[in-house]
């Protein structure tokens, strides 16, 4: 969010990067108030698991009011009211970045009232009459599709980018071939070895090759190629699913390890990682 944040001058961070050559570079650089929310940190830091959403709103509201003490706030103290007061009185919009927006959906799947409260908060922020008056942009990362209740999506005004439908931003999902070759030349690494380990994605209609950026940068630091991703917490969850051997998952994986393709239908997956009805949903 350093690119958008108006509280600093970020030219030194971006002037020598490719983005500086874009026509809109100066248009958005350091032009907005920014809010970064890490939903996982709110979950782990909550004093009461049933008040995660309330505590998140209270903490963010407190921070905003502390940052803008001269703003006249209304008697309605919702987060949206506070943001609207700042945006209208200061004449500057917000850019909000929400990391792992779906963490609560995954961690509290057995608490429907808490989840509905969370979705209603997001709806109030991003699907209301004042949304465009407050936000210049909102970016949310997550594993699951936008959560729905009933037949209506809570946030159907968002554009979703996924591994299956990444266009036109697929080249930003990781390191491209060109970027990886530049790193290999700079740090004296074997490109072919990195390609063997980490170019596991071909995205979009152009089948753009994408390298895992975390793994590549770890090799830049250590000089050693190996499966770094398997040491992450996320892999533990995947391993548990594999060990269940649901609907022949183990056999399908063994087939893929011997270079045999396995067909997977990804379009049927909903938005609940705790409800797996088929091998296709598990792989997705």
Label for each model-derived stretch:
Residues 1-284:
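Phosphate-binding site recognition
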